[in-house]
Amino acid sequence: MQEFTNPFPIDSSSLIHCMTNEISCEMLANGILALGCKPVMADDPREVLDFTKQSQALFINLGHLSAEKEKAIRIAASYAAQVCLPMVVDAVGVTTSSIRKSLVKDLLDYRPTVLKGNMSEIRSLVGLKHHGVGVDASAKDQETEDLLQVLKDWCQTYPGMSFLVTGPKDLIVSENQVAVLENGCTELDWITGTGDLVGALTAVFLSQGKTGFEASCLAVSYLNIAAEKIVVQGMGLEEFRYQVLNQLSLLRRDENWLDTIKGEAYE
C-alpha cells in the first residue's frame, strides 16, 4: 500500500465550511471537531460568501437541495474556484434527480478538488448503466472495471480533480493514481450520514495541504478503521453511532493507524 504521511496533529485554526443536508449536519460538525478542525454550516445566499472567504476548505453536499441552497452553492463554488480553495462536491442523489445531476455537471466547471459519490451515483454521472434508487447505491453496481476506465478519461478532461467512489471496496482515481481500499464494516450502513462524513473528513485533510487523492484515501480509511475498532456483536444502532464519533477522536492518537489501511494503490 502507498505510504501516506500522518496528517495529525491537525491545524486547529482550520475552518471547514460544510454546505450539507440537515439530517447529517450534527454528525459532520462533531466529526470535524473530533479531528481537530472547526466546522461552520452556512447556506443562506446572503451570507455564504462571508463564511466561504474565511474557510480553509469547502464541502458541498447535495442532500436536501432547494432553489435557495442551489444559489448559495453556486456562489460558494464560484469563489472557491477563483481563489483555489480546496473543494469537495458530494453528488448525492444524482441517480434520481435530473436537477442534481445538472448542478453537479455545472459545478465541474469550478474544478472541485474531489468529486465524491457512491458507485451508483458516479456511474450515473459519467453515463454508465446503474441501478441506484433514491440516494442509495445498488449491489448490482459494484463492478469497477468499466467505471475505472471512464474515470481515468474524466480525470484527463478535468485535470487536478480526484474521484472518491464509496462502496464495499472504495475506489479513488486521479490523473495518475488509483487506489482500491478495503477497510470498513457493514455496520456503517446502519446509520445515516456516514457517507456525508467521509466527504467532510476529506475536506479536513485538504485543508492541511493534502492532494485530492491523498485526502480521499485518508478520509475514507480513517472512518472505516475507526468503525472496525468498535464493531461488537449485539451493539444497538444508537450505541454504534455514538462510538463512531467517539473513535474518530481517539484514533488520531494512534501513530500507527496508517499501517492498518487495507488495499492497493498504483499508477
Swiss-Prot record:
<protein>
    <recommendedName>
        <fullName>Hydroxyethylthiazole kinase 2</fullName>
        <ecNumber>2.7.1.50</ecNumber>
    </recommendedName>
</protein>
<dbReference type="GO" id="GO:0009228">
    <property type="term" value="P:thiamine biosynthetic process"/>
</dbReference>
<keyword id="KW-0067">ATP-binding</keyword>
<dbReference type="InterPro" id="IPR000417">
    <property type="entry name" value="Hyethyz_kinase"/>
</dbReference>
<dbReference type="GO" id="GO:0000287">
    <property type="term" value="F:magnesium ion binding"/>
</dbReference>
<dbReference type="InterPro" id="IPR029056">
    <property type="entry name" value="Ribokinase-like"/>
</dbReference>
<keyword id="KW-0418">Kinase</keyword>
<dbReference type="GO" id="GO:0009229">
    <property type="term" value="P:thiamine diphosphate biosynthetic process"/>
</dbReference>
<keyword id="KW-0479">Metal-binding</keyword>
<feature type="binding site">
    <location>
        <position position="41"/>
    </location>
    <ligand>
        <name>substrate</name>
    </ligand>
</feature>
<keyword id="KW-0784">Thiamine biosynthesis</keyword>
<dbReference type="GO" id="GO:0004417">
    <property type="term" value="F:hydroxyethylthiazole kinase activity"/>
</dbReference>
<dbReference type="GO" id="GO:0005524">
    <property type="term" value="F:ATP binding"/>
</dbReference>
<feature type="binding site">
    <location>
        <position position="166"/>
    </location>
    <ligand>
        <name>ATP</name>
    </ligand>
</feature>
<dbReference type="Pfam" id="PF02110">
    <property type="entry name" value="HK"/>
</dbReference>
<keyword id="KW-0460">Magnesium</keyword>
<comment type="function">
    <text>Catalyzes the phosphorylation of the hydroxyl group of 4-methyl-5-beta-hydroxyethylthiazole (THZ).</text>
</comment>
<feature type="binding site">
    <location>
        <position position="116"/>
    </location>
    <ligand>
        <name>ATP</name>
    </ligand>
</feature>
<feature type="binding site">
    <location>
        <position position="193"/>
    </location>
    <ligand>
        <name>substrate</name>
    </ligand>
</feature>
<keyword id="KW-0808">Transferase</keyword>
<keyword id="KW-0547">Nucleotide-binding</keyword>
<comment type="pathway">
    <text>Cofactor biosynthesis; thiamine diphosphate biosynthesis; 4-methyl-5-(2-phosphoethyl)-thiazole from 5-(2-hydroxyethyl)-4-methylthiazole: step 1/1.</text>
</comment>
<comment type="similarity">
    <text>Belongs to the Thz kinase family.</text>
</comment>
